[in-house]
């Protein structure tokens, strides 16, 4: 019996040992599997974010390019000055505001056939609820009600302080929501899950209501309606996308003009004014600060509370003060003119190398950008520097004016008539006054709308976005101590889980647009604050399709979308990549190492991605650890050409520049009609030709416009604009090929070649 019992124990021990080993093996496999999935998820996330931030940098560069042109162009008439003002500031004349406030929307008739929601003011809770239901059923609000709602919203916002105060004493809880970006499904889901706004349920929406999503108009209308119904319980903060210049690139302007073709211009003009009146931050129980982006080491809540926020029309363009002319500087400029030299602003080199296009910026533009009085990064000039620049600028304007008069281009101005200033000098205020935000005020607003937290100590310029700052834990700690705060809630950044704590849990990022990059890419979230101010976070996925996917399926789907976008980015820079590959192939063997491939790709795209980890998804495996780069570039071209029947080199240009071209089109289309008129084309061409030494008559400009107007309807639409760009690129490529062939023939005949093609 004893022997039998010991044998049974021995076998039981062996079985248990095998079971433990099997469990450990399964656990190890599972952990490896989950680690690989997490690595894929993080790489995918980095791809999406890098491409998004690269687009923001392109927006800043494009705007700087147009600012460069406008800042060095003196209009020859009030008509030209008004056009340039509309390009960037959409000047709000007092008489327009008075007309709108006087009920201009009442002249818009609502037809009997209209079946959408109807509004009457003052709004009641049932009106706002009906609006949500109508939008859920994909009904559209009539332009009359849109304008009426916007006018009432503007009147309400104008009465609010820059920093709203919310107390949990009057509401059971305060719900803070982050970016929505035109995703109506997320807004409806929040109301469904958390409840509609009420006196017991306060809401704070933390900016970025518009752009990127397809329902930005509907999101705005719902938010504005509930704010009017519950003015004490429903609060809105301004985000960096509540900006008409940002809207030109990211879709909101296009959406408004598509949905409201007749009254879209008036709606956009009113929205620009409404955005300027949005409060900048919200304080909950004086302990929790809610703002869109973040803070900097210079953030001053007292200054933010008392500045005139309506002056900040756009955070993309700082408006400097007008200064009196400097006589000594004027005398020096006059001497230059008498000697036949063209006046050059002080911050440009005397050779004045001008940018030929917003896609290839020259040294002159770089010097200009380095010397601009107000650019988006952290630093800002002092008052003496601004004064000197204003004086130089005025002297240049005077000097150019004299040149025009001497050349007979302008009639003698009437006595007392002032010289026109460049459009960034001022913005016309109600009553004819001048709105002049100081650089310090402008920087305060830029910092709270554009900044991001960082793990490193200190505060530095946010070069990734092109605006605001990176602020470290020490900056957060000093702000908390100074204003006796316990939590900073911000948005502005998409997070995989919809939220993220940092800086010792004193900074909370909330992002409410789920599936932001792709279906399944991220969750949305909102945070609830009770009297104890303990954050309670709720996560969600507004798209039901993601609920049926496994984690592996969801990551694979998002990864495929990210890699497709990355391959498009690589194809758009094929020419630059080929140049870099050749530098690393001195023997012209046609192959480079995979390590050189990764280095070359990063040097061209500057996306900061882990290219060696992404290599298996982008490059076919090679036993020799080398890559035939020409065949790889050809494979990228074939993938894109399968979707577009266009020559590879031309398609590359369109892929690279389409967003910039569409933004340029909307900038030139200053009245938001969806077309470039002959007058808009003429004024823009004068702007370019004046700085590129191109002599062309008005008849020549008209002929050029007619050549672009392919369907001869009297104006240029976006398709004609892009087609003209394609044809110009094609002719340039054909001319380049012809020049190469000619230089080759010359070299073969024994003569020296003028240089490489």
UniProtKB/Swiss-Prot annotation:
Q: Name one Pfam family in it.
A: PPP5
**Cross-referenced InterPro entries:** Calcineurin-like_PHP_ApaH (IPR004843), EF-hand-dom_pair (IPR011992), EF_Hand_1_Ca_BS (IPR018247), EF_hand_dom (IPR002048), Metallo-depent_PP-like (IPR029052), PPP_dom (IPR013235), PPP_phosphatase (IPR051134), Ser/Thr-Pase_EF-hand_contain (IPR012008)
- Per UniProt, Mn(2+) 1 binds at 179, 181, 208
| Stretches the record annotates as Catalytic | 128-544
Give the tissue specificity. Answer: Detected in retina, more specifically in photoreceptors.
| Free-text comment on the cofactor | Binds 2 manganese ions per subunit.
Q: What is the annotated role of this protein in its UniProt record?
A: May play a role in phototransduction. May dephosphorylate photoactivated rhodopsin. May function as a calcium sensing regulator of ionic currents, energy production or synaptic transmission.
Query: Would you identify the family this protein belongs to, as annotated?
Result: Belongs to the PPP phosphatase family.
Q: What is this protein called?
A: Serine/threonine-protein phosphatase with EF-hands 2
- In which organism is this protein found? Mus musculus (Mouse)
């Amino acid at each position: 019996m004893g022997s039998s019992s010991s044998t049974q124990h021995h076998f039981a021990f062996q079985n248990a040992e095998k079971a433990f080993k099997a469990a450990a093996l399964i656990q190890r496999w599972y952990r490896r599997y989950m680690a690989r999935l997490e690595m894929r998820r993080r790489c995918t996330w980095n791809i999406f974010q890098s491409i998004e931030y690269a687009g923001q940098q392109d927006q800043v560069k494009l705007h700087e390019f147009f600012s460069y042109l406008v800042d060095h162009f003196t209009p020859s008439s009030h008509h030209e000055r008004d056009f340039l003002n509309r390009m960037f500031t959409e000047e709000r004349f007092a008489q327009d505001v008075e007309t709108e406030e006087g009920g201009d929307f009442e002249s818009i008739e609502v037809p009997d056939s209209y079946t959408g929601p109807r509004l009457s003011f003052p709004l009641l809770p049932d009106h706002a609820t009906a609006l949500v239901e109508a939008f859920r059923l994909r009904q559209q609000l009539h332009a009359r009600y849109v304008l009426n709602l916007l006018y009432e919203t503007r009147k309400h916002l104008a009465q609010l302080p820059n920093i709203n105060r919310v107390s949990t004493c009057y509401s059971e809880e305060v719900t803070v929501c982050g970016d929505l970006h035109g995703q109506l499904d997320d807004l409806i889901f929040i109301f469904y899950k958390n409840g509609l706004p009420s006196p017991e349920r306060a809401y704070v929406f933390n900016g970025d209501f518009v752009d990127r999503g397809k329902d930005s108009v509907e999101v705005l209308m719902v938010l504005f309606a509930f704010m009017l119904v519950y003015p004490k319980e429903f609060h809105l903060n301004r985000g960096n996308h509540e900006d008409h210049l940002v809207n030109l690139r990211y879709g909101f302007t296009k959406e408004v003009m598509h949905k409201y073709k007749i009254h879209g211009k008036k709606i956009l003009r009113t929205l620009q004014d409404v955005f300027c009146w949005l409060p900048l931050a919200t304080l909950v129980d004086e302990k929790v600060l809610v703002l869109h982006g973040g803070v900097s080491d210079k953030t001053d809540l007292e200054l933010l509370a008392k500045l005139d926020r309506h002056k900040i029309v756009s955070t993309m363009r700082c408006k400097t003060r007008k200064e009196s002319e400097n006589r000594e500087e004027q005398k020096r400029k006059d001497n230059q003119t008498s000697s036949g030299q063209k006046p050059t602003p002080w911050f440009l080199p005397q050779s004045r190398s001008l940018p030929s296009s917003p896609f290839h910026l020259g040294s002159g533009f770089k010097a200009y950008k380095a010397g601009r009085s107000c650019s988006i990064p952290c630093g800002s000039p002092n008052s003496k520097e601004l004064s000197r620049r204003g004086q130089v600028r005025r002297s240049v304007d005077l000097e150019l004016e004299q040149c025009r008069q001497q050349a007979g281009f302008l009639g003698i101005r009437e006595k007392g008539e002032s010289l026109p200033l460049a459009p960034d000098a001022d913005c016309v205020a109600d009553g004819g006054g001048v709105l002049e935000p100081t650089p310090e005020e402008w920087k305060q607003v830029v910092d709270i709308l554009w900044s991001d937290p960082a793990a490193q100590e200190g505060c530095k310029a946010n070069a990734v976005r092109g605006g605001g700052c990176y602020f470290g834990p020490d900056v957060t700690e000093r702000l908390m101590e100074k204003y006796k705060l316990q939590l900073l809630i911000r948005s502005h950044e998409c997070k995989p889980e919809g939220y993220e704590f940092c800086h010792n849990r004193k900074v909370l990022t909330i992002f409410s647009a789920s599936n932001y990059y792709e279906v399944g890419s991220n969750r949305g979230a909102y945070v609830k604050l009770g009297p104890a101010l303990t954050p309670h976070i709720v996560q969600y996925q507004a798209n039901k399709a993601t609920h049926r996917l496994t984690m592996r399926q969801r990551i694979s789907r998002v990864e495929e979308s990210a890699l497709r976008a990355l391959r498009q980015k690589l194809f758009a820079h094929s020419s630059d990549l080929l140049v870099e590959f050749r530098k690393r192939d001195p023997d012209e063997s046609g192959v480079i190492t995979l390590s050189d491939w990764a280095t070359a790709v990063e040097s061209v795209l500057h996306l900061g991605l882990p290219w060696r980890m992404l290599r298996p998804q982008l490059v076919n495996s090679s036993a020799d650890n080398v890559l035939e780069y020409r065949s790889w570039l050809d494979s990228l071209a074939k993938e894109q050409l399968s979707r577009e029947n266009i020559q590879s080199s031309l398609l590359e240009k369109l892929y690279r520049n389409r967003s910039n071209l569409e933004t340029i089109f909307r900038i030139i289309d200053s009245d938001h009609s969806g077309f470039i008129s002959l007058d808009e084309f003429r004024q823009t061409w004068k702007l370019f030709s004046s700085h590129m030494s191109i002599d062309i008559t008005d008849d020549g400009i008209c002929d050029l416009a007619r050549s672009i107007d392919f369907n001869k309807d009297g104006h240029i639409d976006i398709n004609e604009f892009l087609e003209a760009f394609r044809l110009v690129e094609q002719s340039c490529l054909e001319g380049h090929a012809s020049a190469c062939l000619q230089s080759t023939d010359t070299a073969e005949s024994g003569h020296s070649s003028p240089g490489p093609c």
